[in-house]
C-alpha cells in the first residue's frame, strides 16, 4: 500500500465516498477543497485500487484542517487509517490542526492528540421564508468585507479559498442594516440532498435568523442544512426558531492548541471537510 497525492479523478471518487457516508457534501465541494493545498489531499492505494483518503489542508503557516478521513468499508480494521493519519500529520507539521470527529471515533482522534472543543450539530429543514430590508445579495464591493469577516472567524489564512467560495453558483446573502456596512453573511450551496449553508457569520441571533430566512426565500421548497456551532450558546436556539431539526453531529477538535475565536459571531460552519 502506498500513500500519494490525489488526482482530480481520485478526488471525485472520494467525494462519492463522502456522500455514501451520509455527509451530504456540496456538489462542487471537491473543486474548492483543491484550492488551498492540493498536496494535502492524500489517498491510500493498494494494488492500483483506492482504499482510503484524508485531506490535511494547510491554511498558512499556523493552521491546518483535517477532513475527508475515510477508509473504504472493506479495508477497515487494518492499518490503512493509521498510515493515512500519520502521513497527514507529517504534512501539517507543528501547526494547530482542526478536525471534525465523528462521535463513534472520538477515542481514535484523542489518541492522536486531538482534544474536543464543541459540537457541530447539523440541523435540517425548510425554514419559513422571509425577506428583510437589512439583508441583500452580495455585491462586488462587498467581497473584501465578507472575506475579512470570515478571516476574523477562522484561525488560518483561507482568504483565497473564500473568494472562490463566494463566486460561481453559490448563493450569498449579506446583513447590512440601514444600507450600511456589511457585518454578517451566509452562503448556501447545492448539496447531494438540498442545500448546505455555511459559513454563517452574524453579529447577533436576529441577523443570523434573517439571513437564513432570506436564503430560504431564494430557494423555495428546498431543504436547508446548517452545521450549527454549539460553541455559540444561542446558535441551537436560532436553528430551532427556524424550524430545523437536529441530525448528524460531530466534535470540533484541535491538536497542538485551541485557537481563540469569536464564537458569539459564528453560527454555522463552512464545511466539515475544510473547516
Q: Could you tell me what each predicted segment is?
A:
Residues 1-29, 117-157, 265-270:
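Short amphipathic alpha-helix that is part of the acyltransferase structural core
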Residues 7-12, 45-46, 58, 62, ...:
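Intrinsically disordered, low-complexity, positively biased terminal segments
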Residues 26, 31-52, 65, 119, ...:
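A short helix-loop-beta-strand connector motif used in the catalytic cores of GNAT acetyltransferases and
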Residues 31, 102, 122, 252:
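Residue-level "edge-of-site" marker
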Residues 68-70:
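Non-membrane alpha-helical segments in proteins
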Residues 103-118:
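Internal alpha/beta loop-helix hairpins
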Residues 115-123, 245-251:
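Short Pro/Gly-enriched coil loops immediately N-terminal to beta-strands
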